[in-house]
Swiss-Prot record:
NCBIfam families in alphabetical order: spore_YlmC_YmxH
Pfam families: PRC (PF05239)
InterPro entries tied to this protein: PRC-brl_dom, PRC_barrel-like_sf, Spore_YlmC/YmxH
The name this protein goes by in its record: Uncharacterized protein CA_C1697
UniProt similarity note: Belongs to the YlmC/YmxH family.
The organism of origin for this protein: Clostridium acetobutylicum (strain ATCC 824 / DSM 792 / JCM 1419 / IAM 19013 / LMG 5710 / NBRC 13948 / NRRL B-527 / VKM B-1787 / 2291 / W)
Gene3D superfamilies (UniProt xref): PRC-barrel domain (2.30.30.240)
Length: 87
């Protein structure tokens, strides 16, 4: 059985949507990868920039297990466990 696969570049152009609220969360900015297990741990989305043009936004981290479905042009996630990274 062939599993569907997507390139990182293709995934970065897919809209990420919370299935609970229907909210568009944005596009993938980065991936967090476990280099020992060769697995994706989470996806990182750019957060909203509060405070003006030059302010740093808080990134949103979504655990890979919270991804419900990867389609042709959209990624559906369970947004109950969103983590906002305030680095």
């Amino acid at each position: 059985m062939d599993l569907p696969s997507h390139s990182i570049n293709a995934m970065k152009s897919m809209e990420v949507i919370d299935i609970n609220t229907g909210t568009k969360l944005g596009l993938i900015k980065d991936l967090k990868i476990d280099t020992e297990e060769y697995k994706v741990i989470s996806i990182i989305l750019p957060g909203s920039k509060v405070g003006g043009w030059f302010s740093k936004g808080n990134d949103i981290e979504i655990d890979w297990t919270d991804i419900q479905k990867i389609g042709v042009d959209v990624i559906l996630v369970n947004g109950d466990n969103l983590f906002v990274n305030k680095d």
